[in-house]
Amino acid sequence: MIKCLALIFLIAMTATSGLTNARQRLDDALIAVGLDSAAPAPSASPAPAPDNAATNDATACDGVTFTRNLKYGDHQLNVLDVASAQAPGAKRPVVVFVAGDTFASDGKTSAKSPLVEQAMCFAGRNGLVAFSMSYRLAPAAPWPAGAKDVAAAISWVHENADLFGGNKEEIIPIGYAAGAFHLASFLAHSEFQESDSYVAGAVLVSGIYRPDSDPGEAEKSYFGSDASKYDGQSSLPGLTRIHVPLVVAWSQVDAQRFVAQGEKLKDTLCGAGHCPRTALLSKASSPASVFDLDGASADLHDRLRQLIGQIDARGLP
């Protein structure tokens, strides 16, 4: 199956040159700030990381280089990781994972998600350049900090995608859980976007798109306790005015509010003449669902392949 998917993604590649020189520019830049461009990357089934691990948290992902902790902003959480294969002469589509299970910090240091790592490894092996971003958390960074961080990260990717063989015209962010809200907010609120934060499409998985009327403590920490402001913080109106293609997915075993919000987003977009591609997952969703690494997300993987094909076809005569 993986070989078949590799062929599908490789078909989506477009020709370019100069990756070797770009890689040297990247290495020089990383050395200048004390970083190593060749940090280890994960296998398909990484072992648990030791407590004191920072970036050396997994074994090798054959054929893929992971570059860690690239700063896109001033905060310690404003960092990106990237996974890319050494493929001179090719500009590849770019995916950016915006994945997070919560809106607020619990005061502990969060480990890198092994599911995101696996998805990045798979993407790098199959004709894509994959980034993952972390972002600021409430209560220190309330709404709209998440959306602004997405904008800053996408802007950084625009400026630097070529260093990893990526095509800045084919950037597809993938938001999961709380990250789906931040990505949706970025898309829906043009005032949070930056001049070079254009995306070619987006994938939203198991998110909320309007604060609940009775939010939990983490959401209240991010959105505030004044429910009269929640409509203004909603992504639903703004998403009807964007022109990039969307994929919206949720799981049939998600909490009911996630199912309801996914269905509401779909209905709202279709009512505005901007129907998204949708996928209903049979198991609990995860960042790895976009590549069907859980064996239960073939529909979502198909939607992503269709989206990449649609975006790639725009450059054809």
Which stretches of residues belong to each language-model region?
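N-terminal cap/lid segment of alpha/beta-hydrolase-fold proteins
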Residues: R25-A90
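Mobile cap/lid helix-loop segments that gate and shape the active-site cleft of serine hydrolases
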Residues: T59-D62, A200, G207-G238, V244
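Short beta-strand element of the alpha/beta-hydrolase
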Residues: K91-T102
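Serine-hydrolase catalytic-loop signature spanning alpha/beta hydrolases and amidase-signature enzymes
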Residues: T102-S110, A130, W156
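Short amphipathic alpha-helix adjacent to the substrate-entry channel of hydrolases
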Residues: T109-F131
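Primarily recognizes the serine-hydrolase "nucleophile elbow" in alpha/beta-hydrolase
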Residues: A152-A218
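Short beta-strand/loop motif that positions the catalytic acidic residue
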Residues: I242, V248-W250
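C-terminal catalytic histidine-bearing segment of alpha/beta-hydrolase fold enzymes
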Residues: A249, Q256-V259, E263-K266, C270-P317
